[in-house]
Amino acid sequence: MKKTALTIITIALGSLGAVYFLPSEPAAQKDIRATSQHDTSVDNTSAKAFLDYSLSTLGEKPLQTITQDVVREERALGELQLDEQLFALYLRYKQALADLDIEITGSDIISLETLHQAILDLQREYFSAQQIDLIFGEENQLRALALEKARLSEQGYSAEEQKQLWRDHLALQPEYVQESDANRRLMSELAQGEDAQTTYLKRVELVGEAGAQRLEVLDQNRAEFDRVFQHYLVQRSAILDDLGLSDEQKHKQITMLRETSFDAKQWRRIEALERIADGG
């Protein structure tokens, strides 16, 4: 069965050749976040994270502005090793990745390896070995690690043997890989529903006391947002179901409800969540 290899946001570039760059300017501190990102921090933990964070604003900001922001941020930080040419290559790669279509017959190892190799081959078409390591090094290693774990599950080992072999293999990996696996296990355990104290203690073990406290605050903020949003949806539904209102009146009342219920920086996010709640 024909199946798209990866689910990613297709970047609406129009013609990839129509990417223009503004003249160089002196480095300057500037808030490069779009309106919908004002409740987040700029993700510059890695070159790829920053590129994807920047591209997520496409639609709110023109591509030319995003390009200038990427270059300006690199000049300010001096750590990401990004320039106009590399950014343009990344745009072309993302489009090619979105178009990547290969034959997937299931979740067997051969199919997964085929997908993994197709991604590596595509990266080599656009980037040098040094650039691949800079942008995709961690992602590629984690994907290879997932393949290794899948191989173990198909080799007839008992559950306990698989766990021990996996721990041995993981111990040989870089620290960031081990942390990633630990976080994945934590999220899986949390999804199964543990009491708050057990959850907190596991977080302390994985990310330290300060990290666990930050995660707890995030949980509280997320729960509060969910509560407010669900109440908002109930009120919005009542407006939509009111037969005495015209479509224009409904639109105005919902807009007023949205703007009085949430901060301005959240409005675009709320509109997107409304579309999801409405089924698209």
Swiss-Prot record:
Entry function: May be involved in the folding of the extracellular lipase during its passage through the periplasm.
Name this protein carries in UniProt: Lipase chaperone
NCBIfam families the UniProt entry points to: PRK01294.1-5
Keyword Protein biosynthesis tagged: no
Phylogenetic classification of the source organism: Bacteria, Pseudomonadati, Pseudomonadota, Gammaproteobacteria, Vibrionales
MF-aspect GO terms: unfolded protein binding
Family named by the database record: Belongs to the lipase chaperone family.
Record's keyword terms, sorted: Cell inner membrane, Cell membrane, Chaperone, Lipid degradation, Lipid metabolism, Membrane, Transmembrane, Transmembrane helix
Subcellular location: Cell inner membrane
SUPFAM superfamilies in the cross-refs: Lipase chaperone-like
